[in-house]
């Protein structure tokens, strides 16, 4: 009996060690990414439902052709990760890269997200993209609550914000902070999931499913219009639909002299 009592704990220990080692080689689930070196700024004040006070008027008119372009590229509730693999290659762009001095406005298009999430941006030198969250020193909120009217927020299609002028050699990444807006306290929770343009900053353990941001260039010349669309939940979750149209905005890029 003594031999059995010594043997069982040893067996259990070996099973645990084997399981842990095996788990290290299986990229399942996700690991929280902490942005401990990041400061957060709002471009303007915002009301209790997270609508910013710096909306530019008149708002943009969302044309039927633009709406059709979005739905053709990213149909709702479809697995667009499988349907459009060309959008998710390692070389497909999820950032804006400025080669000339450029004015940027960001326009809200639509939202069908599960939560009240915040959309913001960060900048970096094009030749030095971020490789870890400590390199994201500042995130600026564009839409503190990027939720539509009658969907937990007050945004309507065409609402837009001027986010400034950027110089050549600068790049801009976007971030959706999942379930971050708290209307009861008029605050933004910064310790939850950040889904960023840079795949390496996202929480999924499997690198092949870390993409959360898709940028599509709409056929215009100057100003250039780039659609930015988000997948708003952890993609390692089996309930995730991979449609990448939970929140859609666009950036209008106007080259200035």
Regions found by a protein language model. Give the residues of each.
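Extracellular distal adhesion/interaction modules in secreted or cell-surface proteins
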Residues: 24-248, 254-255
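Low-complexity, intrinsically disordered short peptide segments enriched in small/polar/basic residues
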Residues: 1, 12-14
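C-terminal motif of bacterial Sec signal peptides marking the signal peptidase cleavage site
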Residues: 16-19
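Sec-dependent N-terminal signal peptides
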Residues: 6-12
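Positively charged n-region of N-terminal signal peptides that target proteins for export
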Residues: 1-6, 21
């Amino acid at each position: 009996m003594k031999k059995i009592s010594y043997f069982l704990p040893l067996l259990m220990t070996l099973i645990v060690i084997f399981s842990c080692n095996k788990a290290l080689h299986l990229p399942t689930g996700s690991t929280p990414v902490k942005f401990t070196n990041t400061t957060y700024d709002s471009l303007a004040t915002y009301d209790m439902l997270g609508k910013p006070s710096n909306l530019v008027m008149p708002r943009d008119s969302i044309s039927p052709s633009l709406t059709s372009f979005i739905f053709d590229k990213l149909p709702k509730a479809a697995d667009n990760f499988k349907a459009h693999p060309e959008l998710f290659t390692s070389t497909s762009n999820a950032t804006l890269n400025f080669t000339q001095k450029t004015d940027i406005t960001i326009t809200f298009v639509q939202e069908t997200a599960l939560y009240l999430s915040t959309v913001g941006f960060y900048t970096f030198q094009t030749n030095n993209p971020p490789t870890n969250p400590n390199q994201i020193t500042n995130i600026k909120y564009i839409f503190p609550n990027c939720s539509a009217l009658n969907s937990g927020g007050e945004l309507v299609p065409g609402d837009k914000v001027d986010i400034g002028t950027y110089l050549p050699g600068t790049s801009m990444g976007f971030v959706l902070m999942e379930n971050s807006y708290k209307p009861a306290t008029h605050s933004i929770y910064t310790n939850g999931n950040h889904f960023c343009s840079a795949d390496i900053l996202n929480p999924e353990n499997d690198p092949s499913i870390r993409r959360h941001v898709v940028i599509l260039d709409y056929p215009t010349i100057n100003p250039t219009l780039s659609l930015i669309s988000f997948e708003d939940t952890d993609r390692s979750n089996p309930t995730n639909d991979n449609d990448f149209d939970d929140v859609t905005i666009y950036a209008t890029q106007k080259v200035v002299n």
